[in-house]
Amino acid sequence: MSDNERTIVVRVLKFDPQSAVSKPHFKEYQLKETPSMTLFIALNLIREHQDPDLSFDFVCRAGICGSCAMMVNGRPRLACKTLTSSFESGVITLMPMPSFTLIKDLSVNTGDWFLDMTKRVESWAHSKEEVDITRPEKRVEPDEAQEVFELDRCIECGCCIASCGTKLMRPNFIGAAGMNRAMRFMIDSHDERNDDDFYELVGDDDGVFGCMSLIACHDTCPKELPLQSSIATLRNRMLKVGKSR
């Protein structure tokens, strides 16, 4: 055993809403920390050796799918990208992300929320003419393509939603993910909608005007999307539409 090896404590909020006898409670697990150990590795060791009933989500293990997002010491993070060594005390408290339907323990249903958001902001390219999918898409300038790609890097992990104070007060608020998605299509020349069209979708208190600019979303996004500037640009464009009415 290495002299530098330490024992860490992982506290998990456990609860199964589908069980008539389950009650929310914290359960502690102790395990030996290994070099470069992530929370994903720790949780898998816990489930394999201590608690096979522990529920959490994962797919890619590389910070690409967003499935393993959870509250880590009160802050939303990706378990697969969070090193246990970054917590000096060695005590790590894990809870499911708020604002999403709880499935069990650390597992929440982000899929239904993002599907509903996708429909609300109509996040697909709108064309006034029927699109011939057998022909190449209309070309765009490299700068535009880069701007669209930058906003399109969202992995739908839900960290921005879980950290949003407005979302906790307004259940129907589309959050940074929704506003970023709207902005992504506003700057895409393949989408033929104008600002008035987007105003009908996000120009209210459940949309961009409900944002209190706390910018927790910007601070917690694991992909470091430019959410602050994206939301500010969207708000300015929607304000111009609102003033013209």
From Swiss-Prot:
Residues covered by the 2Fe-2S ferredoxin-type domain: 17-98
Provenance organism: Helicobacter pylori (strain ATCC 700392 / 26695)
Protein keywords: 2Fe-2S, 3Fe-4S, 4Fe-4S, Electron transport, Iron, Iron-sulfur, Metal-binding, Oxidoreductase, Transport, Tricarboxylic acid cycle
NCBIfam families given in the database record: dhsB, PRK13552.1
Reaction catalyzed: a menaquinone + succinate = a menaquinol + fumarate
This protein's name: Fumarate reductase iron-sulfur subunit
Ranges where the 4Fe-4S ferredoxin-type domain occurs: 145-174
A Gene Ontology BP annotation from the UniProt entry: respiratory electron transport chain
SUPFAM superfamilies for the chain: 2Fe-2S ferredoxin-like, alpha-helical ferredoxin
PANTHER family: FUMARATE REDUCTASE IRON-SULFUR SUBUNIT, SUCCINATE DEHYDROGENASE IRON-SULFUR PROTEIN
Gene3D superfamilies, per database record: 3.10.20.30, Alpha-helical ferredoxin
Positions bound to [2Fe-2S] cluster: 60, 65, 68, 80
Cofactor note: Binds 1 [2Fe-2S] cluster. Binds 1 [3Fe-4S] cluster.
One of the Pfam families matching this protein, by short name: Fer2_3
Cofactor(s) this protein requires: [2Fe-2S] cluster; [3Fe-4S] cluster; [4Fe-4S] cluster
Family: Belongs to the succinate dehydrogenase/fumarate reductase iron-sulfur protein family.
GO molecular function, one term: metal ion binding
Binding site for [4Fe-4S] cluster: 154, 157, 160, 221
Binding site residues for [3Fe-4S] cluster: 164, 211, 217
Subunit record text: Part of an enzyme complex containing three subunits: a flavoprotein (frdA), an iron-sulfur protein (frdB), and diheme cytochrome b (frdC).
EC numbers: 1.3.5.1
